[in-house]
């Protein structure tokens, strides 16, 4: 039995259901600390925030602080997560969590440390790269485990901006590190892969010690680090937390926290058993390295915190790969350009995992299978599909959980397109508006029935996806406008659509079935806050309806969570049906994340 992290929570912290905000010291970000990155985990049940002083991990809904790490040197409180197993060694871990300015690939999962040197021309922005700073510019979670990907950032970076840190939060120290010649812009994690996004490259590593480089893909200039990774579809690799019980949720008694024990002794490796060199190079857990951030609900089981994959729509393709190949080739000829006649296969027995990123040309999206069956140790080469999605550069893209659908928007921000990753066929084309906008976030709902889109105009759109129009994903049943009956008919169309022939494309567009301008709520939020917070919001450009970047996550299939960087607030919007059988987005609750 291993003593896992237990998290201090405040049972009196309530989410707001109106325009009155309450603050709690256990859920706050310092006023003087700028949020640098917000990312949800793979099932969107948690989200992580990195800022100028460290990082935090929250449960998504209900919002609840799970982890708080403060990297400020000589700070009175370096963390606010109760972990008695580390004891007095926690401060030493904070002082020694950097691998040094020379760069390295290291593993700290066992007593035998493996180190591999890398040369780099970059040093830490804070000086020698010894970790004397505190800013975390990027954070990515690996489901609910204790492994997080960190990159230094902000005015005083904790780590060099060209260095990827795999942080073991159970030991509060660096587990792996990778250093590059250019800044690391984004990191995507799965249980078998580490995806590193550079300015013009995507590098795929195995999640092992030391990490093994599998593939490198060149891209168009990608300063925003745009990329997305689906959840690994191999069922045998999904259940990391098979020993998690309903009793593992922590209990609060008389203001004290009861610690929780987890048994991970049955788990030996983060890599699956069929992974190359898994016996010698995997990150060994040894019963001590892996823990989870449990859901606050005491009735939540292990399967609730693990993304489960269903492959029902793909059954026809898997059963008859020859037919599927022919269909994919024909479709790609008329709609897109593809580098392979073989479609991406997402069978139940495969280890399929979709990686999507901008291609080498403007408006192109490259789709690659980076699953565990594709690595340099075998003769199996990854299937690569190219989708010509837009005429302008890609600004935002997202995959559904199974990696069968990809939604994308260009820098114009007026049109949202959904393609099949297997056949590259265009399935839907939605219109956001007629004026330019920056799409800041997009997410599919958990059941792939809806797509939520958020822009810099603070408008949240939700589009309905009619799955009955592409049951076999072969292209023949697809549609370019998202209409035609079923659930897709909820989306709005222009009144003249279908009445007159040869209408311009604008009149044939499909619009979201519900939307909301979040500014109408933010204006009242500003009025209810203190004068000091009002001045801060105005200084950040948010008080007068200025630009703020929100990040979307789904809570269920009818509730959308938005986390705002500058305003530092959490919001929950719910899709409700009105009396006239229309749909609307209502803000049901919100909470400030700053003090």
Curated annotation (Swiss-Prot):
GO cellular-component term (any): phagophore assembly site membrane
Gene Ontology MF terms in the entry: phosphatidylinositol-3,5-bisphosphate binding; phosphatidylinositol-3-phosphate binding; protein-macromolecule adaptor activity
Subcellular location field: Vacuole membrane; Cytoplasmic vesicle membrane
Region (Disordered): 1-28, 76-132, 264-342, 467-490
Pfam families in UniProt: PROPPIN
Residue stretches in coiled coil: none
WD repeat positions: 30-68, 389-429, 434-473
Residue stretches of biased makeup (Low complexity): 76-112, 270-339
Biased composition (Gly residues): 474-488
Mode of membrane association: Peripheral membrane protein
Keywords: Cytoplasmic vesicle, Membrane, Protein transport, Repeat, Transport, Vacuole, WD repeat
GO biological process: autophagy of mitochondrion; glycophagy; nucleophagy; pexophagy; protein localization to phagophore assembly site; protein transport
Family statement: Belongs to the WD repeat PROPPIN family.
Protein function: Involved in mitochondrial or peroxisomal functions and amino acid signaling pathways.
Domain notes: May contain a beta-propeller domain involved in specific binding to phosphatidylinositol 3,5-bisphosphate (PIP2), leading to the association of the protein to the membrane.
Name listed for the protein in its UniProt record: SVP1-like protein 2
Organism from which the protein derives: Candida albicans (strain SC5314 / ATCC MYA-2876) (Yeast)
Source organism phylogeny: Eukaryota, Fungi, Dikarya, Ascomycota, Saccharomycotina
